Amino acid sequence: MTAVAANPTKIGGHGPPLQGMIIRDAVEADLPAIVEIYNAAIRGRISTAQLDPVSIDERLPWFREHSPESHPLWVDEIDGQIAGWLSFHSFITRCAYRGTAEISVYVSEKFRRLGLGRVLLEKAIAHSSHLEINALVGRIFGHNEPSLRLFERLGFERWGFLPRIARVDDVERDLVIVGRHISAQA
């Protein structure tokens, strides 16, 4: 994927216009910003089951598992700052699932509620057929209503529900599995 400039109008109909936004393949130099965004999500306790902050060194193997040709990791860059990221990764490594990818989307606290998650997710849906992906899935905590609404607005359905499967700070949390089939024209 080459860098793609986003339309410099209001993103998702919210907030001020954002000039200079591009979505591009992540490079290793982006890893500190990616980790910073992820660690903020860990502290928020709403979007990941990871409980302890991670280091750049700990995330390096995960970073290197991504490839622009099959399981990309994209960053959303605004005026030289990483505002968010989206990753594709194997859903299940058995051969029959190779056409299914799990996606994760994280947006910096500073850039939330501007529609960046939607822009990243729309790009993932549109690009999936080029990656020979015919289904996308996501795992979202049941109490993460903003993410559930976002995915549902973009055609994802609730494909699974695992009640009280995660324990976060002594609170049992439900996990919702959302999914969407990708048409060849996506």
Question: PLM features: what roles do these ranges have?
Answer:
Residues A6-N7, G12, P16-G20:
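Short, low-complexity intrinsically disordered segments enriched in A/P/G/S/L with frequent Arg
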Residues R113-A126, E145-R153:
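Conserved acetyl-CoA-binding loop-helix of GNAT-fold acetyltransferases
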Residues S128-I140:
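Conserved GNAT acetyl-CoA-binding A-motif
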